[in-house]
């Protein structure tokens, strides 16, 4: 049987049962109706529980604007400073660094950061962060914290349109998401490799099915029913291409054999919100290994794959329920990717 459309191979549950779930962030308030800070740590690749570790840190919290008579949309009454009012929720990715302290010290240092926020626009809408009051616990991330940071607004803010342009805005950290990295590295497939198209190849893509602890339909993320009749979500990632000698036919059995030899293990992390980590513990073909820069661990941040889905579920519980390998013929080389809605060189449209 040759592959002309798509074929599916379902991985055994043992490939994701150990590290395929994320606990939710608890949103609790104290007697003063202030949100109680919390740190959540996920371990990828068997890192040490204490002592020197490599941590990827992702801050979550609320945007707060200066109060005035005018009213803007707000998401909560969880006010910290009476002169400021919550106007949205969002995040601040800090990245990976080596950390030697304990979790609670890191949480305390993060909640004491003085973060000013500005909304602007370049090629896309951006959020600008300026950070002061950096405690020693956060010095490993100081190279980013001491400089202004810009991020795509649709990746770090749930509702960027609610951030006013004529008032001061602060970002108040409530939650700290950490991914502790052991022997696993944070390798991300380069965009040039992800867009690679070669003749006589089969594209191996992964479809990851997840369930979450919140209702997402009202937030524009429609859940579907799985084979058990339960609501679930899914997203896709690209693993790479496999190639046969010219004239040899691809079969479903051949592709399944290739993927089974790789012995893939799947984990969920908190890089950029929610992230998928794939670890190849078996043998990899030379063609595919070269596309992966001969790395065996790949990180797929949902922030880059599906920003809106990431924004909706990044604080909730997430659990992998199924992973499928999708075998699809590689797109012909003459197909072109159009990232811009306006096509260049067509009619009266000028480049």
From Swiss-Prot:
A single Pfam family it belongs to is: Matrix_Paramyxo_N
Entry keyword annotation includes Repeat? no
Gene3D superfamilies to which the protein is assigned, alphabetical: Viral matrix protein, C-terminal domain, Viral matrix protein, N-terminal domain
Q: Give the UniProt subcellular location, in the record's own words.
A: Virion
This protein's UniProt keywords: Viral envelope protein, Viral matrix protein, Virion
Q: Name one GO biological process term.
A: virion assembly
**GO CC annotation: what is one?**
viral envelope
Q: Which GO terms describe its molecular function?
A: structural constituent of virion
UniProt xrefs under InterPro entries: Matrix_C (IPR042539), Matrix_N (IPR042540), Matrix_Paramyxo_C (IPR055413), Matrix_Paramyxo_N (IPR000982)
The record's similarity note reads: Belongs to the morbillivirus/respirovirus/rubulavirus M protein family.
UniProt-recorded name of the protein: Matrix protein
Which species expresses this protein natively?
A: Bovine parainfluenza 3 virus
């Amino acid at each position: 049987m040759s592959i002309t459309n798509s074929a599916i191979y379902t991985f055994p549950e043992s490939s994701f049962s150990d590290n395929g779930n994320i606990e939710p962030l608890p949103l609790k308030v104290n007697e003063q109706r202030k949100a109680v800070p919390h740190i959540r740590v996920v371990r990828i690749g068997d890192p040490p529980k204490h002592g020197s570790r490599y941590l990827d840190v992702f801050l979550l919290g609320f945007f707060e604007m200066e109060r005035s008579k005018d009213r803007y949309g707000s998401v909560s009454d969880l006010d910290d400073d009476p002169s400021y009012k919550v106007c949205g929720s969002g995040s601040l990715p800090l990245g990976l660094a080596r950390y030697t302290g304990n979790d609670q010290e890191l949480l305390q240092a993060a909640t004491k950061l003085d973060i000013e926020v500005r909304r602007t626009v370049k090629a896309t809408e951006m959020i600008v962060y300026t950070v002061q009051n950096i405690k020693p616990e956060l010095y490993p991330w100081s190279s980013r914290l001491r400089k202004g940071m810009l991020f795509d607004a649709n990746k770090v803010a749930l509702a960027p349109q609610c951030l006013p342009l004529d008032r001061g805005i602060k970002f108040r950290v409530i939650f700290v998401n950490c991914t502790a990295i052991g022997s696993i590295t944070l390798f991300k497939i380069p965009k040039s490799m992800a867009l690679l198209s070669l003749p006589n190849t089969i594209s191996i893509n992964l479809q990851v099915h997840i369930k979450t602890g919140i209702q997402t339909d009202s937030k524009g993320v429609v859940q579907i029913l799985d084979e058990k009749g339960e609501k679930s979500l899914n997203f896709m990632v690209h693993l790479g291409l496999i190639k046969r000698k010219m004239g040899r036919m691809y079969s479903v059995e051949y592709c399944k054999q290739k993927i089974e030899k790789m012995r893939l293990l799947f984990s969920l992390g908190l890089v950029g919100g929610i992230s998928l980590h794939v670890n190849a513990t078996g043998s990899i073909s030379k063609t595919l290994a070269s596309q992966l820069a001969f790395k065996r661990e790949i990180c797929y941040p949902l922030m880059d794959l599906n920003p809106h889905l990431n924004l909706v579920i990044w604080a909730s519980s997430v659990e992998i329920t199924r992973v499928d390998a999708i075998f699809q013929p590689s797109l012909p080389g003459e197909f072109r990717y159009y990232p811009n809605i306006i096509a260049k060189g067509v009619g009266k449209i000028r480049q």
